[in-house]
Amino acid sequence: MKLNVDGLLVYFPYDYIYPEQFSYMLELKRTLDAKGHGVLEMPSGTGKTVSLLALIVAYQRAFPLEVTKLIYCSRTVPEIEKVIEELRKLLSFYEQQEGEKLPFLGLALSSRKNLCIHPEVTPLRFGKDVDGKCHSLTASYVRAQYQQDASLPHCRFYEEFDAHGRQVPLPAGIYNLDDLKALGQRQGWCPYFLARYSILHANVVVYSYHYLLDPKIADLVSKELARKAVVVFDEAHNIDNVCIDSMSVNLTRRTLDRCQSNLDTLQKTVLRIKETDEQRLRDEYRRLVEGLREASAARETDAHLANPVLPDEVLQEAVPGSIRTAEHFLGFLRRLLEYVKWRLRVQHVVQESPPAFLSGLAQRVCIQRKPLRFCAERLRSLLHTLEIADLADFSPLTLLANFATLVSTYAKGFTIIIEPFDDRTPTIANPILHFSCMDASLAIKPVFERFQSVIITSGTLSPLDIYPKILDFHPVTMATFTMTLARVCLCPMIIGRGNDQVAISSKFETREDIAVIRNYGNLLLEMSAVVPDGIVAFFTSYQYMESTVASWYEQGILENIQRNKLLFIETQDGAETSVALEKYQEACENGRGAILLSVARGKVSEGIDFVHHYGRAVIMFGVPYVYTQSRILKARLEYLRDQFQIRENDFLTFDAMRHAAQCVGRAIRGKTDYGLMVFADKRFARADKRGKLPRWIQEHLTDSNLNLTVDEGVQVAKYFLRQMAQPFHREDQLGLSLLSLEQLQSEETLRRVEQIAQQL
């Protein structure tokens, strides 16, 4: 259908539209008109992706000079593929309406591991090895040697792409990862470099967060993208953690030992080259005097280790004299390494700021701040000059150099914590240095400054106002949308007591209490008797899950549960978990029914949708607070309190509730889907916890369902499931939660649509 969204003609590839999709498009258009940033919370399963794509593509076509590109960031590869499929649908609808092929290019970009087609590289399992192997076949000096001697190893796909792929831009169309690989096989071009080259003139690019937020990668991939782009972060409820991880470095004793052997290897290589080809080292010295910008003008294939973060003025100036020659630089790294090793020989925990660390460094081993900032770049230049083929071996040393660059660049927003042992195993000496980022806004700030509109969206962003605070930006629109339903298909309830009236909670004091564990088991047992097909249960941590399940086994509860449904458990091993998931789905298909026990913040809670019968009930055992004794977390809470005036308790509750909402949101994946959401902890009933749930869940959480016993909860569930089992046709939805074009244009509907969005 063709819609008029606030004066913009939008092609929408379906015959009917949800009212909230229309409302979402209105808010989105206002954000783009204002050329600002937006935070939008849209209920899960209401067609967020297609609304985003339809509106922004229409905007691109109406104002080609205002918005040149859509950069869509998603979290996992399956999600990226989903977005590309929606885009394909949208485009074929455009072509069917206009009767001609559009000059439109949309593509997905992923790591070499997912795109490489070279027969020697594809069998490798880990991304790091794939990158290293690729570099050893495509580095500029490897290719130069191959020009002289054709028998040397090389990558024919890259050679072919380099020779012919650049003149011909990618033909218009939509490409997912498999399409790119197929095209690569057909033409004999490298799909990875083809995709990287093509994102510059693509209309829509879909890739993962790291390509924009991790400065080491963003510098390589996203540097050339124009300012007039719209960036969308989808499923962005965890975006602050992604930002923090991309800027943090952990150094262990093992890493440092491997740095030592890296340095020895480099030392030998330098000596060998001095004897055979001293001119090469002289050339490098000359380049470094001219400034880093010249030194890094090497080919794209060599830019394998990018720089963590360097402002432009540093790249312009010459490298300090003390680290210009290769031997001096290696000596410099040795002194740095010795100092860090010495710092790791501690008996108690040390916490200090980067400036304090630097002054200690200057006093002990006379290393100044300025040469440290050049460490990462200087190492990159050296590895290039020495023609090191396999860069994966040098990742420990690269990590140390990145740490040096970061520690000398940022004085605020970071902390250094040195722990002599892991808290969980205090007897084993296992020292580790955490260089931990506490300010999520550091990584995302360049994105907000560089692109004219950044949209942060997810099903669970409540409370909305905390995101602009922790990411430090000013949105022009902030809105949360309700879910318009023809029948109430979600049933949230809070179970706070067992049948024996014992309060149930996962808090630390009552965690080991046998009565609480028994009541939790009883809840799962009774639910497994009334809920059809699949139940997903989330615990607060792996430890808690293991101890609870062991206790249920002793009490014979597990045996009774198994009579109703089969049990599957998520473990920390990825391969085991995928098998468990597969079998869980099989058991649901066969009608045997299944229960999946998993962990909030685990793999299952983040990316896996339990559509229809795979998840008819989600049970949240306890409030999923993060492990609060961790020193890194304490430092971050302190920073948030001082810098952004966010109270510790508010942040912890916000963090726990967004994860709880994320877990229970897995059950509802569309308006025809239905499911129970059981919050099993008396603390959920408190106003401060309940108020932090997304608006679309809060609306259906009635006062009568706030503090139930297990029996009352089961009665509510029975009644709800019986209602849901009645036949439900599309006709029942029409005009209420599903609109045709005529209905959408009526005044009454437009008035209703106005009320869906709640601005902040």
From Swiss-Prot:
Known role: ATP-dependent 5'-3' DNA helicase. Component of the general transcription and DNA repair factor IIH (TFIIH) core complex which is involved in general and transcription-coupled nucleotide excision repair (NER) of damaged DNA. When complexed to CDK-activating kinase (CAK), involved in transcription by RNA polymerase II. In NER, TFIIH acts by opening DNA around the lesion to allow the excision of the damaged oligonucleotide and its replacement by a new DNA fragment. The ATP-dependent helicase activity of XPD/ERCC2 is required for DNA opening.
Top-level taxon of origin: Eukaryota
Record text on subunit structure and interactions: Component of the 7-subunit TFIIH core complex composed of XPB/ERCC3, XPD/ERCC2, GTF2H1, GTF2H2, GTF2H3, GTF2H4 and GTF2H5, which is active in NER. The core complex associates with the 3-subunit CDK-activating kinase (CAK) module composed of CCNH/cyclin H, CDK7 and MNAT1 to form the 10-subunit holoenzyme (holo-TFIIH) active in transcription. The interaction with GTF2H2 results in the stimulation of the 5'-->3' helicase activity. Component of the MMXD complex, which includes CIAO1, ERCC2, CIAO2B, MMS19 and SLC25A5. Interacts with CIAO1 and CIAO2B; the interaction WITH CIAO2B is direct.
Species per Swiss-Prot/TrEMBL record: Cricetulus griseus (Chinese hamster)
EC code: 5.6.2.3
Cofactor binding note of this UniProt entry: Binds 1 [4Fe-4S] cluster.
The protein's name: General transcription and DNA repair factor IIH helicase subunit XPD
PTM section of the record: ISGylated.
